[in-house]
């Protein structure tokens, strides 16, 4: 037509298999065979309790009619070109993964399974999302050419069936929740005194609770803080729901200019593993030393809890909680290039990893705290033609 240069509507649907055999989830090889240990369990008897009798123990029951993990895939897309300038590509995808091999956690031990809960193709997971790319290019004059491009991706997933046991609290279930989510305790600030500790639910999380430690919410109201009080504190995890990019190239006479930005959103960063609040006893980072709770700084709103000589003395503060949860969204000024063409070549200036804009300020939001940082680089060069 006068305005539409090209229009294509695409669609596909198929059933594919996956060779994932459950090894990553703890399954063993040769699942079609019962596995029995002859010296794994027993009892001790005798006058002096010095005689032990061992008996057989089934460690893995054979999987009957086990099969491949399967995926039903649907993709609907459109390719559109308008005004000989604008190109749009959009896709919607939906994947229903089933027959996932997992432990039958819903089977009670009273049926005689003990530690050998059977494996079965019961798991189900859904994935869906959209992808969009747009490119606009226009030659205004013989001296001026502009090219804009952008891309956007949004994805979601959730557990549909995990054959979970019957939990005493509904918030412990994973069914219906995202795969990449953040689970932990709900923090309620820092303890300011021993009196406050004595009048609060008991916290037995690996170390003796002292003033300056993190206080957690007793979600189930049983007077103690334990694994039953862990909830989904964010529907997002380290894998972002949204990823995007935006770039531009401009040519004017002998000059050329280009930039590109990329970023992600709906992403959570947990910083509870940073030193000295991780599993290793390293030096204190400067931003922690600047604002942590201490007897000389008994600020209940300090950014970081009290310190200890070893990580075992502060185990209460190292568990995952909202205290350590941060917004991991960011926009990165990825590349910049400016060039000038002359008769025998081109001279240029470019840069990579120019800047990062994010509410998270401690380190590069794309990296972990102990990773080597991305380098910011600038180059000046000359390209010669002979």
Task: Describe each model-derived feature in a short phrase.
Residues 211, 264-345, 351:
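Extracytoplasmic gating/loop element in the C-terminal half of outer-membrane beta-barrel translocons
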Residues 120-240, 251, 262-267, 273:
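Gram-negative outer-membrane beta-barrel transporters
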Residues 1-180, 320-386:
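Extracellular/periplasmic, surface-exposed regions of secreted and cell-surface proteins
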Residues 35-61, 175-237, 286-322:
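Flexible glycine-rich, low-complexity coil/linker segments exposed to the extracellular/periplasmic environment
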Residues 103-106, 225-227, 275-277:
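Conserved active-site-proximal loop/helix segments of enzymes involved in bacterial cell-wall
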């Amino acid at each position: 037509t006068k305005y539409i240069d090209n229009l294509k509507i695409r669609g596909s649907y198929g059933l594919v298999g996956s060779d994932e055999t459950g090894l990553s989830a703890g399954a063993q090889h040769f699942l079609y065979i019962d596995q029995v240990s002859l010296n794994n369990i027993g009892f001790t008897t005798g006058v002096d309790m010095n005689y032990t009798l061992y008996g057989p123990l089934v460690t893995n029951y054979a999987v009957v009619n086990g099969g491949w993990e399967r995926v039903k895939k649907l993709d609907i897309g459109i390719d559109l070109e308008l005004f000989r300038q604008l190109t749009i590509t959009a896709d919607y995808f939906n994947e229903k993964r089933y027959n996932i091999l997992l432990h039958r956690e819903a089977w009670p031990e009273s049926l005689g399974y003990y530690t050998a809960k059977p494996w079965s193709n019961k798991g189900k997971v859904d994935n869906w999302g959209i992808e969009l790319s747009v490119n606009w290019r226009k030659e205004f004059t013989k001296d001026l050419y502009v090219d804009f491009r952008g891309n956007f991706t949004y994805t979601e997933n959730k557990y549909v069936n995990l054959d979970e046991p019957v939990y005493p609290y509904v918030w412990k279930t994973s069914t219906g929740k995202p795969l990449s989510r953040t689970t932990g305790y709900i923090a309620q600030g820092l303890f300011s005194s021993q009196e406050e500790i004595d009048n609060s639910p008991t916290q037995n999380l690996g170390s003796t609770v002292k003033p300056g430690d993190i206080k957690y919410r007793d979600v189930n109201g049983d007077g103690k803080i334990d694994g039953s009080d862990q909830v989904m504190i964010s529907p997002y995890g380290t894998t972002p729901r949204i990823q995007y990019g935006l770039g531009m190239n401009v040519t004017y006479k002998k000059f050329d200019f280009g930039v590109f930005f990329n970023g992600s959103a709906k992403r959570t960063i947990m910083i509870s593993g940073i030193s000295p609040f991780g599993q290793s006893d390293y030096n204190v980072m400067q931003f922690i030393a600047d604002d942590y709770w201490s007897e000389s700084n008994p600020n209940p709103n300090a950014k970081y809890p009290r310190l200890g000589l070893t990580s075992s003395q502060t185990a209460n503060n190292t568990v995952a909680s909202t205290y350590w949860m941060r917004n991991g969204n960011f926009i990165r000024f990825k590349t910049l290039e400016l060039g000038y063409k002359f008769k025998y070549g081109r001279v240029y200036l470019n840069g990579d990893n120019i800047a990062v804009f994010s509410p998270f300020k401690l380190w590069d939001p794309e990296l972990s705290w102990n990773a080597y940082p991305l380098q910011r680089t600038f180059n000046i060069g000359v390209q010669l033609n002979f």
